[in-house]
Every structure is written in structure tokens, then in C-alpha cells.
Amino acid sequence: ISRGLVGSEMCIRDRVKKGIGNHTPVLKKPQDVVLFGFGRIGRLITRLILEDTGAGETFSLKAVVVRQSKAEDLFKRAELMRRDSVHGSFKGTIRVDEESNTLVMNGNPVKFIYANNPDEVDYSKHNIDKAILIDNTGVYRDKKGLSKHLKSKGVSKVLLTAPTKGELKNIVYGVNHKDISDKDKILGAASCTTNAIVPLLKAISEEYGIDNGCLLYTSPSPRDLDL
């Protein structure tokens, strides 16, 4: 067994040897990111950016846009970030800066901006430039609604964390990500079901072929489902 493990480790090291010890930045300049919404999806994206992508040298989460709430709103959002029933505790530190309305997470200051509509915010005032805005509210899903984000100064592209409607592209990375062009300013990330099954179906189809099939999935009841 030990020989097998050693052999597997050597094989893996040989495959990834070009990446081992390579600390060359992926991007010449960190990519500014803005979250529109801070529900569970927004908080999980925040975790991915701040826990797994370093100290902002690749993706730099600059701001979160939410609706105005109670005076202790920022403290409530900090507590929600600290704990998740599935993913556990946040890996790092979270500090509330009331004066600047900022959450400092793992040393990264993230500004919380209060607004009700996408085109109300001038992001350039917050030193945000050519940002990718990730809309995780699901309120706007078509080109007309999501284009409102592009009217705000400081935003260059929009990603929706849900299926888009109309002519907008829905992208599942590893399946059709090569369909993205430089002209695309708005993209959708498709549905959770699509992301779960399509990569598997693609692999099976390419290797063996698929004549027909039936998909059955179990899901909690969403708000928009009439029972």
C-alpha cells in the first residue's frame, strides 16, 4: 500500500510541478469585486474570496450593497458571516468599523453601501474601478434589469448567481465557458441543478454517449413554488 501511495504522490507532483513554488500573480492588477446583496449566497462568495484567494492580490472585494436596515445592521451581518450551519466558522477575523460602515475581514476592508436600486450608487467615489458586480439577489434576471448595474460608475461587468432570462448567456464553467466573449457584459451562472448535473452529463456523453435520460432531484420548497 505504501508503495502505491508513494507512486501516486510522485505522479501528482510530476503533473503539477510547473505550479509548485510559482508565486507569479495571476492578474497584473487585482480585480475589484462588488456584491449586490448579502444573503447566504453573498456571504458564501465573501468566504471564497477572503478565505481562499489570498490577501486580495487576485480578487479584491471592495463593497457590498444592501438595503438600509436598523442601527445595529452591520453587527448583525458580521455575526452572520462568522457562522454558517454547513461550512462552520469563518476562517479568520471580522471587525466592525462603524465610523466607515465597514467590515474588516482578514484585514480586508469591505465597505457596506446602502441603496435600493442598482443605478443609485457611484462606486468610483469609493475607489472602485472596472469592478465585476455579482448580483446575488435574484431580483433582476433579464438584460433590462441587470443593465442598470452598468449605468453605475465603476462597474464594468455583471454576474448573476442565478439563471438569466432572455438572450443572456448562462455559463457552467467546464461545460460552455469558452462561449464567453469580450463583448459579454452580463452573464448568468445558471441554476444549482444545472451546475450539479451538467458537468457529469457532459463527461458521460463525451466518453460513452447518451441516448435519453430522466433527471430526478430533491429540493426544499422555494418561495416562488405554489403548493
Residue ranges and their predicted role:
Residues 1, 5-14, 217-222:
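Conserved small/polar residues in nucleotide/adenosyl-binding loops
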Residues 12-31, 123-124:
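A short, basic/flexible loop-to-alpha-helix module at the beginning of a structural domain
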Residues 30-47:
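Glycine-rich adenosine-cofactor-binding loop
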Residues 60-105:
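Glycine-rich phosphate-binding loop and adjoining beta1-alpha1-beta2 segment
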Residues 88-145:
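A structured beta-alpha segment of the ubiquitous adenosine-cofactor-binding alpha/beta core
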Residues 141-184:
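Rossmann-fold NAD(P)-binding glycine/threonine-rich loop
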Residues 175-191, 211-214:
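Rossmann-fold dehydrogenase core element
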Residues 196-199, 203-219, 223:
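Conserved anion/nucleotide-ligand pocket segment
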